[in-house]
């Protein structure tokens, strides 16, 4: 209907992002189950390494560009930023709509790329010469590049929109130092997107012309260098991983302070500076993904040290969350369970990151399952746990309905066991030298791979249970009578769900 297709309402567009992200998440999860099924026993299941690599590549692209980013930035960002700023809507409401509607064509292009020719079996990094016209002939990689172009344009437009909204549309009284941490996290994320995505666009456009127009940016035969591609890609790719986690940081800050019954997060100004520091440092560490290409020892020393420095502002955030929790009598609501799970598991993932920051160690562990375990701890148990926490926490605000808390707690336990069983053994596999992006392995690696695959099945059950819980809530229609929160953030002063136009008169906020 016209309301959805041509919407200029931040709430409706946010809801579209949630639905799109959930759908893409199911596709991405299905691909991950295929990966674990293939690795669940020695020997072949799919029987074709190209198809296996296409599945791995698509799993990464879908989870990053079509699940985490649309839900965190598009879903939570659109819904909450205007409400938390006391703004009537986003600064550019029609551009907001366009940002969303660029995503379904982008996802379609990605899915089509896997259905024509041989698919793009390059890994999400799309390194040449494997992604060149010789090793990957046909249209698949080109379609994947176009998909990334559209998703990138969508994100850049969204970033401009969020930055403008935050600069221009804050209510009187919301000074920058008093702006909610989630809004801060989104605006920092938007800045990172704005600065990093054009570099990715440049890299993949150069790859496109290398493949189709006979240029040789990345071809040594014509004076090019494949390492240039790696530098360009990772100059985008490292900020990207912070883009995936920063909005999660913002949500976790809100959830922990509200569930602790505190007025604000401990050290909220320090939290802002920490996020700014993470955003800045994220741009000057990219070559730690390239320790194995052969860099000078002093270059490696720099990237090792700079990478470890990121642990400092991250540690400030972890300990501030713990300080916020300090002295509270917690009632273990589902949202706080996810938030506590986030703090613990994100810390574990961060520690393995510090291990990998050591360039000499990384040369051994690069492209092994240790790296896979590291980034799935921070993404599958960082970003995803933050999404789960945020969704459960703000669901009553978004819908005016309540979820079944007892079921949500069981679902948390199932999911917690599932993801840890899936990814913890991968540390052992990596230390034992099992390489990434292979569809088979020597028998010695069987045991932990079987454990990992069992874990992925448990996770799948947890996700299906979650969708059932949401369905049950929607059909039961248990209305929220009044929010039980201590209103530490102004979005809770809305009706549940908020009126279509939340702030007809601009609010005046005083201390």
Swiss-Prot record:
EC number: 7.1.1.9
Organism domain of life: Eukaryota
Keyword Translocase attached: yes
Annotated binding of Mg(2+), by residue: 366-367
Binding residue positions for O2: 242
Catalytic activity: 4 Fe(II)-[cytochrome c] + O2 + 8 H(+)(in) = 4 Fe(III)-[cytochrome c] + 2 H2O + 4 H(+)(out)
InterPro entries according to UniProt: Cyt_c_oxase-like_su1_dom (IPR023616), Cyt_c_oxase-like_su1_sf (IPR036927), Cyt_C_Oxase_1 (IPR000883), Cyt_c_Oxase_su1_BS (IPR023615), Cyt_c_oxase_su1_dom (IPR033944)
Protein function: Component of the cytochrome c oxidase, the last enzyme in the mitochondrial electron transport chain which drives oxidative phosphorylation. The respiratory chain contains 3 multisubunit complexes succinate dehydrogenase (complex II, CII), ubiquinol-cytochrome c oxidoreductase (cytochrome b-c1 complex, complex III, CIII) and cytochrome c oxidase (complex IV, CIV), that cooperate to transfer electrons derived from NADH and succinate to molecular oxygen, creating an electrochemical gradient over the inner membrane that drives transmembrane transport and the ATP synthase.
Family: Belongs to the heme-copper respiratory oxidase family.
Protein name: Cytochrome c oxidase subunit 1
Species the sequence originates in: Drosophila yakuba (Fruit fly)
Taxonomic path: Eukaryota, Metazoa, Ecdysozoa, Arthropoda, Hexapoda
């Amino acid at each position: 209907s016209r309301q959805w297709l041509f919407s200029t309402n931040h709430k409706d567009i946010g809801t579209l992002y949630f639905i799109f992200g959930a759908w893409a998440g199911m596709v991405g999860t299905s691909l991950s189950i295929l990966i674990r099924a293939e690795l669940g026993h020695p020997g072949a299941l799919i029987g074709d390494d190209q198809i296996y690599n296409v599945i791995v590549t698509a799993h990464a692209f879908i989870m990053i560009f079509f699940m985490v980013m649309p839900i965190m930035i598009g879903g939570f960002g659109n819904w909450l930023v205007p409400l938390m700023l006391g703004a009537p809507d986003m600064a550019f409401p029609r551009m907001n709509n366009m940002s969303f509607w660029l995503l379904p064509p982008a996802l379609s292009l990605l899915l089509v790329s896997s259905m024509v020719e041989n698919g793009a079996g390059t890994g999400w990094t799309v390194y040449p010469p494997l992604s060149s016209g010789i090793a990957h002939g046909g249209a698949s990689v080109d379609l994947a590049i176009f998909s990334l172009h559209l998703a990138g344009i969508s994100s850049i437009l969204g970033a401009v929109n969020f930055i403008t909204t935050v600069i221009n549309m804050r209510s009187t009284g919301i000074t920058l130092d008093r702006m909610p941490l989630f809004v801060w996290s989104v605006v920092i994320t938007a800045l990172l997107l704005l600065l990093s995505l054009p570099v990715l666009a440049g890299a993949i456009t150069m790859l496109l012309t290398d493949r189709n127009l006979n240029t040789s940016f990345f071809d040594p035969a014509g004076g090019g260098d494949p390492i240039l591609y790696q530098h360009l890609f990772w100059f985008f790719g490292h900020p990207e991983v912070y883009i995936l986690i920063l909005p999660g940081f913002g949500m976790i800050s809100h959830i922990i302070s509200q569930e602790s019954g505190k007025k604000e997060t401990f050290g909220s100004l320090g939290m802002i500076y920490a996020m700014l520091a993470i955003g800045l440092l994220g741009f000057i560490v990219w070559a730690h993904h390239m320790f194995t290409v052969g860099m000078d020892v002093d270059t490696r020393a720099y990237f090792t040290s700079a990478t470890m420095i990121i642990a400092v502002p991250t540690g400030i955030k972890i300990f501030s969350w713990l300080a916020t929790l300090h002295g509270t009598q917690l009632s273990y609501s589902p949202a706080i369970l996810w938030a506590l799970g986030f703090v613990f598991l994100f810390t574990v993932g961060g520690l393995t990151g510090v291990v990998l920051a050591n360039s000499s160690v990384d040369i051994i562990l690069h492209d092994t399952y240790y790296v896979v375990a590291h980034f799935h701890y921070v993404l599958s148990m960082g970003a995803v746990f933050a999404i789960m926490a945020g969704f459960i926490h703000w669901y009553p605000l978004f819908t005016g309905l309540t979820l079944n808390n007892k079921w949500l707690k069981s679902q948390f336990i199932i999911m917690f066991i599932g993801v840890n069983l899936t990814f913890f053994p991968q540390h052992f596999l990596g230390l034992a030298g099992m390489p990434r992006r292979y569809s088979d392995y020597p028998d010695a690696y069987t045991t932990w791979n079987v454990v990992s695959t069992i874990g992925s099945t448990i996770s799948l059950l947890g996700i299906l249970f979650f969708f059932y819980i949401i369905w049950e809530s929607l059909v039961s229609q248990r209305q929220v009578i009044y929010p039980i929160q201590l209103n530490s953030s102004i979005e809770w002063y809305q009706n549940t769900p908020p009126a279509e136009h939340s702030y007809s008169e601009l609010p005046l906020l005083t201390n």
